[in-house]
Amino acid sequence: MKLVRKDLEKDNAGQVTLIPEEPEDMWHTYNLLQVGDSLRASTIRKVQTESSTGSVGSNRIRTTLTLCVEAIDFDSQACQLRVKGTNIQENEYVKMGAYHTIELEPNRQFTLAKKQWDSVVLERIEQACDPAWNADVAAVVMQEGLAHVCLVTPSMTLTRAKVEVNIPRKRKGNCSQHDRALERFYEQVVQAIQRHINFEVVKCVLVASPGFVREQFCDYMFQQAVKTDNKLLLENRSKFLQVHSSSGHKYVLKEALCDPAVTSRLSDTKAAGEVKALDDFYKMLQHEPDRAFYGLKHVEKANEAMAIDTLLISDELFRHQDVATRARYVKLVDSVRENMGTVRIFSSLHVSGEQLGQLTGVAAILRFPVAELSDQEDESSSEED
């Protein structure tokens, strides 16, 4: 994401102009947008025209509109973002108050205006515009004849290539067809790796499969690299890490990311940091339950006692339609940071973020036990009953 301009007043009202450059930038933009915001962007509008002879036709015209946002739709697979709203600025093709849907496009700037920019939204802009936040983990999830080449970014998992090759079964006395097809499959996966993985940024490439597929593939890849003097692969050989998965489908990537060998190798990446933080929470919940809380009311009371060491919170909560509820989560984040606590904002598109979502989306590891907190909550809930 590229920041073109930022104009904010003292009361944090104002606007920012951004250019989405990567598919993931659409996810960041989705998290920036809220109902009631003002969005100005280039769009296509179907306009009816009347010729001098009186015949009516329609043309698709590119124009720039400013909408008051009413609905936001994000397709996580295609990384497409559509924003519906009413036109709030004069335009020769679109009447004031008319409805329109803008589909934000890569490499086309947009301007987003808010009555108040909170700290969480501003932090997301900083992260989205920081080159260091690009995908630092890649993964090849495979089985015989099927492979997915993925990039694991700080916010989501992107499938960059899917390789499918029909592998005939081995026949007694004749394995040549099977072997040729397998070699063709391996070669296509190698090409996908070279095409889609930026080794200057990526710290680790996971190769995950059932059985011995990953070992056989890696042997083939590096033997060919030696034969062809492929310096790109040979110089980055140490970045490849082989792990087990139950299949070659994309959804099993979570198995690979939770592998202990992987979490230790990826200790300095955000995705691995989220996995470790959630694992630490579960361990604390099991062994010292008075130092592990989840649910907004419990976590807020722990924060009042300045007991929070690490706050775990899902980015999904900051997309809440109710302004007061959203402000409550922002206030919690700001307060924990003021009290020298660590805040980890989890992506709901990551495995760990999904798990946190099952725990209400907010949890905390405490500095010290707060046993009476549970009792107070039980008493207040029984009084309400």
Curated annotation (Swiss-Prot):
Gene3D superfamilies: 3.30.1330.30, eRF1 domain 2, Pelota, domain A. Its cofactor is a divalent metal cation. It is found in: Cytoplasm. Disulfide bonds: none annotated. GO terms for molecular function: metal ion binding; ribosome binding. One of its GO terms (cellular component) is cytoplasm. GO terms for biological process: cell division; nonfunctional rRNA decay; nuclear-transcribed mRNA catabolic process, no-go decay; nuclear-transcribed mRNA catabolic process, non-stop decay; regulation of translation; rescue of stalled ribosome; ribosome disassembly; RNA surveillance. The keyword Glycoprotein does not apply. Its main location: cytoplasm. Belongs to the eukaryotic release factor 1 family. Pelota subfamily. Component of the Pelota-HBS1L complex, also named Dom34-Hbs1 complex, composed of PELO and HBS1L. This is Protein pelota homolog. It comes from Gallus gallus.
